[in-house]
Swiss-Prot record:
Name of protein: Glutamine synthetase cytosolic isozyme 1-1
Class in the EC hierarchy, top level: ligase
Tissue specificity: Highly expressed in leaf blades, at intermediate levels in spikelets (rice flower) and at lower levels in roots.
Localization of this protein: Cytoplasm
Alphabetical UniProt keywords: ATP-binding, Cytoplasm, Ligase, Nucleotide-binding
Inducing stimuli: Induced in roots under nitrogen-limited condition. Down-regulated in roots under ammonium supply. Down-regulated by treatment with cadmium.
Primary subcellular site in the record, as a coarse category: cytoplasm
Length: 356
Protein backbone atom coordinates (compact mmCIF):
# COMPACT_ATOMS: atom_id res chain seq x y z
CA UNK A 1 0.00 0.00 0.00
CA UNK A 2 1.28 3.46 -0.88
CA UNK A 3 2.38 5.64 2.00
CA UNK A 4 0.74 9.01 2.61
CA UNK A 5 3.90 10.71 1.33
CA UNK A 6 3.72 8.70 -1.91
CA UNK A 7 0.10 9.73 -2.44
CA UNK A 8 0.81 13.40 -1.68
CA UNK A 9 3.59 13.32 -4.28
CA UNK A 10 1.59 11.52 -7.01
CA UNK A 11 2.34 12.90 -10.46
CA UNK A 12 -1.08 13.36 -12.06
CA UNK A 13 0.30 14.03 -15.54
CA UNK A 14 1.24 10.34 -15.82
CA UNK A 15 -2.42 9.32 -15.91
CA UNK A 16 -4.66 12.30 -16.69
CA UNK A 17 -4.81 15.61 -18.55
CA UNK A 18 -6.80 17.06 -15.67
CA UNK A 19 -5.17 19.57 -13.34
CA UNK A 20 -5.90 21.02 -9.90
CA UNK A 21 -6.31 24.79 -9.57
CA UNK A 22 -6.03 26.24 -6.05
CA UNK A 23 -8.04 29.48 -5.95
CA UNK A 24 -6.63 31.96 -3.38
CA UNK A 25 -8.35 35.03 -1.97
CA UNK A 26 -8.05 37.53 0.88
CA UNK A 27 -10.51 37.02 3.75
CA UNK A 28 -12.55 39.35 5.90
CA UNK A 29 -9.75 40.71 8.07
CA UNK A 30 -7.95 41.98 4.98
CA UNK A 31 -4.91 39.96 6.04
CA UNK A 32 -6.10 36.34 6.27
CA UNK A 33 -5.70 34.20 3.18
CA UNK A 34 -8.20 31.52 2.16
CA UNK A 35 -8.09 28.94 -0.62
CA UNK A 36 -9.95 26.01 -2.12
CA UNK A 37 -9.27 23.74 -5.07
CA UNK A 38 -11.13 22.61 -8.17
CA UNK A 39 -10.44 20.24 -11.05
CA UNK A 40 -9.94 21.61 -14.57
CA UNK A 41 -9.98 19.58 -17.78
CA UNK A 42 -6.44 20.57 -18.80
CA UNK A 43 -3.54 22.99 -18.33
CA UNK A 44 -4.32 26.73 -18.25
CA UNK A 45 -1.80 29.59 -18.48
CA UNK A 46 -4.10 32.59 -19.04
CA UNK A 47 -6.22 33.72 -16.05
CA UNK A 48 -8.93 35.03 -18.39
CA UNK A 49 -9.48 31.42 -19.53
CA UNK A 50 -10.22 30.26 -15.97
CA UNK A 51 -13.81 29.99 -14.72
CA UNK A 52 -15.08 32.37 -12.06
CA UNK A 53 -16.04 30.64 -8.82
CA UNK A 54 -17.82 31.47 -5.59
CA UNK A 55 -17.56 30.88 -1.86
CA UNK A 56 -19.55 31.37 1.34
CA UNK A 57 -18.72 34.93 2.35
CA UNK A 58 -20.67 34.59 5.61
CA UNK A 59 -17.96 32.18 6.81
CA UNK A 60 -15.13 34.63 6.06
CA UNK A 61 -16.75 37.79 7.46
CA UNK A 62 -17.41 39.18 3.97
CA UNK A 63 -21.15 38.69 3.43
CA UNK A 64 -24.37 38.20 5.47
CA UNK A 65 -25.78 34.69 5.86
CA UNK A 66 -28.96 35.48 3.93
CA UNK A 67 -26.96 36.64 0.88
CA UNK A 68 -23.65 34.88 1.36
CA UNK A 69 -22.31 34.31 -2.14
CA UNK A 70 -19.06 36.08 -3.09
CA UNK A 71 -17.64 35.66 -6.60
CA UNK A 72 -13.96 34.91 -7.26
CA UNK A 73 -12.41 36.49 -10.36
CA UNK A 74 -9.11 34.78 -11.32
CA UNK A 75 -6.38 37.41 -11.84
CA UNK A 76 -2.93 35.77 -11.81
CA UNK A 77 -1.59 32.24 -12.25
CA UNK A 78 1.45 30.66 -10.58
CA UNK A 79 2.83 27.13 -10.70
CA UNK A 80 1.83 25.07 -7.66
CA UNK A 81 5.00 24.06 -5.73
CA UNK A 82 3.02 21.66 -3.52
CA UNK A 83 1.22 19.61 -6.19
CA UNK A 84 3.76 20.34 -8.96
CA UNK A 85 3.11 19.13 -12.53
CA UNK A 86 0.68 21.36 -14.45
CA UNK A 87 -1.24 22.23 -11.28
CA UNK A 88 -1.61 25.93 -10.49
CA UNK A 89 -2.16 28.53 -7.79
CA UNK A 90 -4.65 31.22 -8.81
CA UNK A 91 -4.71 34.64 -7.13
CA UNK A 92 -8.26 35.98 -7.21
CA UNK A 93 -10.11 39.10 -6.15
CA UNK A 94 -13.65 39.19 -4.83
CA UNK A 95 -16.93 40.66 -6.09
CA UNK A 96 -20.64 40.65 -5.33
CA UNK A 97 -22.88 38.65 -7.71
CA UNK A 98 -23.72 42.02 -9.32
CA UNK A 99 -20.05 42.54 -10.18
CA UNK A 100 -19.18 45.16 -7.55
CA UNK A 101 -15.84 44.77 -5.70
CA UNK A 102 -16.46 43.88 -2.04
CA UNK A 103 -14.89 46.19 0.62
CA UNK A 104 -11.85 43.96 1.21
CA UNK A 105 -11.05 43.85 -2.52
CA UNK A 106 -8.21 46.38 -2.66
CA UNK A 107 -6.86 44.96 -5.92
CA UNK A 108 -9.68 46.42 -8.00
CA UNK A 109 -8.83 50.06 -7.25
CA UNK A 110 -5.09 49.38 -7.47
CA UNK A 111 -5.53 47.89 -10.95
CA UNK A 112 -7.41 51.03 -12.05
CA UNK A 113 -4.53 53.23 -10.84
CA UNK A 114 -1.89 51.07 -12.53
CA UNK A 115 -3.81 50.93 -15.82
CA UNK A 116 -4.22 54.73 -16.01
CA UNK A 117 -2.13 56.10 -18.90
CA UNK A 118 -0.15 58.43 -16.61
CA UNK A 119 1.00 55.59 -14.37
CA UNK A 120 1.37 52.89 -17.03
CA UNK A 121 3.69 55.08 -19.11
CA UNK A 122 6.02 55.45 -16.08
CA UNK A 123 6.36 51.65 -15.62
CA UNK A 124 6.54 51.75 -11.79
CA UNK A 125 8.90 49.14 -10.35
CA UNK A 126 8.62 47.80 -6.81
CA UNK A 127 10.87 45.77 -4.57
CA UNK A 128 9.11 44.78 -1.35
CA UNK A 129 11.01 43.55 1.71
CA UNK A 130 8.57 41.35 3.61
CA UNK A 131 9.57 40.75 7.23
CA UNK A 132 7.82 38.14 9.37
CA UNK A 133 8.24 36.29 12.67
CA UNK A 134 8.10 32.53 13.20
CA UNK A 135 6.26 31.50 16.37
CA UNK A 136 6.07 28.26 18.36
CA UNK A 137 2.54 27.02 17.65
CA UNK A 138 0.97 26.42 21.05
CA UNK A 139 2.54 29.28 23.01
CA UNK A 140 2.77 32.10 20.40
CA UNK A 141 6.38 32.79 21.34
CA UNK A 142 9.18 33.26 18.77
CA UNK A 143 10.91 30.20 17.40
CA UNK A 144 14.19 29.53 19.20
CA UNK A 145 13.27 31.59 22.27
CA UNK A 146 13.20 29.82 25.66
CA UNK A 147 9.62 29.22 26.82
CA UNK A 148 8.65 32.10 29.10
CA UNK A 149 12.09 33.66 28.69
CA UNK A 150 14.23 35.75 26.39
CA UNK A 151 17.33 35.14 24.26
CA UNK A 152 20.45 37.27 24.50
CA UNK A 153 20.25 40.88 23.26
CA UNK A 154 20.04 41.74 19.57
CA UNK A 155 23.29 41.89 17.67
CA UNK A 156 24.40 38.40 16.62
CA UNK A 157 21.15 37.37 14.88
CA UNK A 158 20.97 39.61 11.78
CA UNK A 159 22.17 37.43 8.87
CA UNK A 160 23.54 35.14 11.59
CA UNK A 161 24.38 31.46 11.33
CA UNK A 162 24.53 28.70 13.90
CA UNK A 163 22.02 26.84 16.07
CA UNK A 164 22.16 29.54 18.76
CA UNK A 165 21.52 32.42 16.35
CA UNK A 166 19.39 31.18 13.44
CA UNK A 167 15.97 29.59 13.99
CA UNK A 168 13.76 28.23 11.18
CA UNK A 169 16.16 28.30 8.24
CA UNK A 170 14.64 25.09 6.79
CA UNK A 171 11.29 26.90 6.49
CA UNK A 172 12.92 29.98 4.97
CA UNK A 173 14.91 28.03 2.39
CA UNK A 174 11.90 25.87 1.46
CA UNK A 175 9.88 29.03 0.94
CA UNK A 176 12.62 30.61 -1.19
CA UNK A 177 12.76 27.62 -3.55
CA UNK A 178 8.97 27.20 -3.65
CA UNK A 179 8.54 30.85 -4.69
CA UNK A 180 11.14 30.49 -7.45
CA UNK A 181 9.35 27.34 -8.64
CA UNK A 182 5.99 29.15 -8.61
CA UNK A 183 7.29 31.95 -10.84
CA UNK A 184 7.40 34.63 -8.16
CA UNK A 185 10.24 37.11 -8.67
CA UNK A 186 11.67 36.51 -5.19
CA UNK A 187 15.07 38.16 -5.10
CA UNK A 188 16.51 37.12 -1.75
CA UNK A 189 16.12 36.20 1.93
CA UNK A 190 17.93 37.02 5.15
CA UNK A 191 17.73 36.54 8.89
CA UNK A 192 16.55 39.67 10.70
CA UNK A 193 17.73 41.61 13.76
CA UNK A 194 15.32 39.94 16.18
CA UNK A 195 15.88 36.18 16.58
CA UNK A 196 13.10 34.15 14.95
CA UNK A 197 12.43 36.96 12.49
CA UNK A 198 13.18 36.68 8.76
CA UNK A 199 12.75 38.62 5.56
CA UNK A 200 12.17 37.81 1.91
CA UNK A 201 12.26 40.28 -0.96
CA UNK A 202 9.97 40.30 -4.00
CA UNK A 203 10.91 42.35 -7.05
CA UNK A 204 11.59 44.22 -9.08
CA UNK A 205 7.97 43.76 -10.15
CA UNK A 206 5.93 46.10 -12.32
CA UNK A 207 2.61 47.61 -11.25
CA UNK A 208 -0.17 45.31 -10.07
CA UNK A 209 2.04 42.20 -10.35
CA UNK A 210 3.96 43.34 -7.23
CA UNK A 211 0.83 42.93 -5.10
CA UNK A 212 -0.10 39.60 -6.70
CA UNK A 213 3.37 38.21 -6.10
CA UNK A 214 3.64 39.34 -2.46
CA UNK A 215 0.23 37.87 -1.62
CA UNK A 216 1.03 34.52 -3.24
CA UNK A 217 4.47 34.48 -1.57
CA UNK A 218 2.67 34.99 1.76
CA UNK A 219 0.28 32.17 0.88
CA UNK A 220 3.15 29.79 0.11
CA UNK A 221 4.85 30.76 3.38
CA UNK A 222 1.66 30.04 5.36
CA UNK A 223 1.34 26.64 3.68
CA UNK A 224 4.97 25.74 4.45
CA UNK A 225 4.69 26.81 8.10
CA UNK A 226 1.47 24.76 8.30
CA UNK A 227 3.45 21.68 7.25
CA UNK A 228 6.22 22.52 9.73
CA UNK A 229 3.79 23.04 12.63
CA UNK A 230 4.97 26.63 13.10
CA UNK A 231 2.91 29.85 13.06
CA UNK A 232 3.93 32.83 10.91
CA UNK A 233 3.13 36.28 12.27
CA UNK A 234 3.01 39.51 10.28
CA UNK A 235 2.46 41.61 13.41
CA UNK A 236 4.58 44.78 13.11
CA UNK A 237 5.76 44.53 16.74
CA UNK A 238 5.28 40.94 17.93
CA UNK A 239 7.39 41.36 21.09
CA UNK A 240 7.22 44.62 23.08
CA UNK A 241 10.41 46.14 24.42
CA UNK A 242 13.95 46.37 23.07
CA UNK A 243 13.32 44.20 20.00
CA UNK A 244 13.03 45.22 16.36
CA UNK A 245 9.60 45.32 14.80
CA UNK A 246 8.64 43.89 11.41
CA UNK A 247 8.10 46.03 8.34
CA UNK A 248 7.55 45.79 4.61
CA UNK A 249 9.97 48.38 3.24
CA UNK A 250 8.85 49.28 -0.27
CA UNK A 251 11.48 50.22 -2.86
CA UNK A 252 10.10 52.22 -5.76
CA UNK A 253 11.11 53.84 -9.01
CA UNK A 254 9.50 55.16 -12.16
CA UNK A 255 10.96 55.33 -15.66
CA UNK A 256 11.69 59.04 -15.12
CA UNK A 257 13.56 58.27 -11.88
CA UNK A 258 15.63 55.57 -13.56
CA UNK A 259 16.67 57.88 -16.43
CA UNK A 260 19.32 60.61 -16.37
CA UNK A 261 18.22 63.47 -14.15
CA UNK A 262 16.03 61.13 -12.15
CA UNK A 263 17.33 62.30 -8.78
CA UNK A 264 15.38 65.55 -9.12
CA UNK A 265 12.23 63.53 -9.89
CA UNK A 266 12.92 61.41 -6.79
CA UNK A 267 13.24 64.49 -4.57
CA UNK A 268 10.00 65.90 -5.99
CA UNK A 269 8.23 62.57 -5.34
CA UNK A 270 9.51 62.47 -1.75
CA UNK A 271 8.17 65.99 -1.18
CA UNK A 272 4.73 64.78 -2.32
CA UNK A 273 4.95 61.82 0.08
CA UNK A 274 5.76 64.27 2.88
CA UNK A 275 2.63 66.30 2.13
CA UNK A 276 0.45 63.16 2.31
CA UNK A 277 2.27 61.54 5.25
CA UNK A 278 -0.86 61.10 7.41
CA UNK A 279 -2.89 59.54 4.60
CA UNK A 280 -0.12 57.06 3.83
CA UNK A 281 0.44 56.13 7.49
CA UNK A 282 -3.28 55.41 7.92
CA UNK A 283 -3.10 52.95 4.98
CA UNK A 284 0.26 51.34 5.77
CA UNK A 285 -0.83 48.58 8.16
CA UNK A 286 -2.48 47.88 11.51
CA UNK A 287 -0.55 48.46 14.74
CA UNK A 288 2.22 50.39 13.01
CA UNK A 289 2.31 52.90 15.87
CA UNK A 290 3.89 50.16 18.01
CA UNK A 291 6.71 49.84 15.46
CA UNK A 292 7.36 53.39 14.20
CA UNK A 293 8.77 54.81 17.43
CA UNK A 294 11.97 56.46 16.21
CA UNK A 295 13.97 53.54 17.62
CA UNK A 296 15.05 50.18 16.17
CA UNK A 297 15.77 51.57 12.68
CA UNK A 298 12.45 53.40 12.32
CA UNK A 299 11.28 57.00 12.06
CA UNK A 300 8.69 58.39 14.46
CA UNK A 301 5.18 57.78 13.10
CA UNK A 302 4.15 61.44 13.45
CA UNK A 303 7.16 62.97 11.71
CA UNK A 304 8.15 62.61 8.05
CA UNK A 305 11.86 62.56 7.29
CA UNK A 306 14.13 61.44 4.49
CA UNK A 307 17.85 61.05 4.01
CA UNK A 308 20.61 59.36 2.07
CA UNK A 309 21.57 55.98 3.58
CA UNK A 310 19.53 56.84 6.71
CA UNK A 311 17.67 53.84 8.11
CA UNK A 312 16.12 56.01 10.80
CA UNK A 313 14.22 58.05 8.19
CA UNK A 314 10.70 57.60 6.79
CA UNK A 315 12.18 57.43 3.28
CA UNK A 316 15.73 56.36 2.49
CA UNK A 317 17.64 57.16 -0.69
CA UNK A 318 20.57 54.87 -1.43
CA UNK A 319 24.08 56.24 -1.68
CA UNK A 320 24.36 54.80 -5.20
CA UNK A 321 21.22 56.63 -6.35
CA UNK A 322 22.63 59.92 -5.07
CA UNK A 323 25.97 59.32 -6.82
CA UNK A 324 24.41 58.23 -10.12
CA UNK A 325 21.84 61.01 -10.11
CA UNK A 326 19.09 58.45 -10.81
CA UNK A 327 17.63 55.24 -9.38
CA UNK A 328 15.05 54.47 -6.71
CA UNK A 329 14.05 55.22 -3.12
CA UNK A 330 12.80 53.14 -0.19
CA UNK A 331 9.62 53.94 1.74
CA UNK A 332 10.39 52.46 5.18
CA UNK A 333 7.01 53.21 6.74
CA UNK A 334 4.82 50.23 5.67
CA UNK A 335 4.20 47.61 8.37
CA UNK A 336 4.72 43.90 7.77
CA UNK A 337 0.93 43.39 7.67
CA UNK A 338 0.32 46.04 5.00
CA UNK A 339 -1.75 45.26 1.92
CA UNK A 340 0.69 45.47 -1.03
CA UNK A 341 -2.15 46.41 -3.39
CA UNK A 342 -2.88 49.50 -1.27
CA UNK A 343 0.74 50.51 -0.63
CA UNK A 344 2.06 50.11 -4.18
CA UNK A 345 -0.89 51.86 -5.84
CA UNK A 346 -0.95 54.66 -3.27
CA UNK A 347 2.74 55.42 -3.79
CA UNK A 348 2.15 55.53 -7.56
CA UNK A 349 -0.94 57.71 -7.20
CA UNK A 350 0.77 60.20 -4.86
CA UNK A 351 4.01 60.49 -6.83
CA UNK A 352 2.63 60.38 -10.40
CA UNK A 353 -1.04 61.47 -10.46
CA UNK A 354 -1.60 63.64 -7.37
CA UNK A 355 -1.13 67.38 -7.73
CA UNK A 356 -0.45 69.26 -4.45
Amino acid sequence: MASLTDLVNLNLSDTTEKIIAEYIWIGGSGMDLRSKARTLSGPVTDPSKLPKWNYDGSSTGQAPGEDSEVILYPQAIFKDPFRKGNNILVMCDCYTPAGEPIPTNKRHNAAKIFSSPEVASEEPWYGIEQEYTLLQKDINWPLGWPVGGFPGPQGPYYCGIGADKSFGRDIVDSHYKACLYAGINISGINGEVMPGQWEFQVGPSVGISAGDQVWVARYILERITEIAGVVVSFDPKPIPGDWNGAGAHTNYSTKSMRNDGGYEIIKSAIEKLKLRHKEHISAYGEGNERRLTGRHETADINTFSWGVANRGASVRVGRETEQNGKGYFEDRRPASNMDPYIVTSMIAETTIIWKP
